[in-house]
């Protein structure tokens, strides 16, 4: 969140600025129409919104947990946009009452931070997704997703300028991917995993359903992309629940290494090392796409998702990335960056002029 302040703002010290910023956040939260406190949680600020979402503060940051919905529908997008609208309406009231110029919210996945030695580092939060699935499919759910999520980066990434090493910047598919270090893990703030093992069921533990907690994906602005990735993940869970088995010969040898390499090399021609052979990124996507096409019956949204997934893969194959502007975050950002770099005759490694 950025705040365009009144005169005198720049004369404040860091502690005063932090306190002032927090007062703005608290003011925004107080102006949001809350339904009820979110029982069972012990955070300082934790409420349900009218659309069923939950809003709370964590480490002095406003976070919104979207309302429960059926994955594979448009409900997730509707709830997410509703939460954004509620937040923006409250912010506009604060802008007017405090005579600020503006308050801007950014849906991002990384930010500046410090390590234990006080060095500047990039920190990440990403987007957490929880899915309920039939417990009997637990093993295959993990097997499918741990292999498919690396291949989903060009579908799910929000785009990022990443400092590969000092002074060397590259464009990546994802803001989140380079911060993933393992397949399974409990911690969300460091040594992050593709699948988080904080998976206690959100329902009756004896109901036959388990919770899948994914912390590996980016939050995205393009509604189409958010819907697409959510629905594809839903289809992968359906495959596991309905008995599809990913053959061992088609599993990745090094999923985490593949995520990092694919992301930083920003290459749609990337090939994965499988147990039995090498397979291109696009063909590996087709392996899962063809399996999902065999699911019966398919809803209207599921059919639409499969059609769009295939259309995007064909655009990847033809290198027609600009055709995805407005549909995929990373493609949209890359289009804008390329245009600006051409206009100013600069590169990603050009020094930023001080204003």
Regions found by a protein language model. Give the residues of each.
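Acidic pyrophosphate-coordinating catalytic loop
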Residues: 180-182
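Long amphipathic N-terminal alpha/beta scaffold segment
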Residues: 165-167
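Terminal catalytic/cofactor-binding subdomain
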Residues: 1-108, 113, 123, 143-163, ...
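Histidine-centered divalent-metal-coordination microenvironment in nucleic-acid enzymes
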Residues: 109-110, 116-134
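A short alpha->loop->secondary-structure connector
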Residues: 138-140
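A generic structural signal for beta-strand entry/edge sites
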Residues: 61, 128-130, 170, 211
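Extended amphipathic ligand-handling, pore-lining, and cofactor/metal-binding catalytic surfaces
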Residues: 173-174
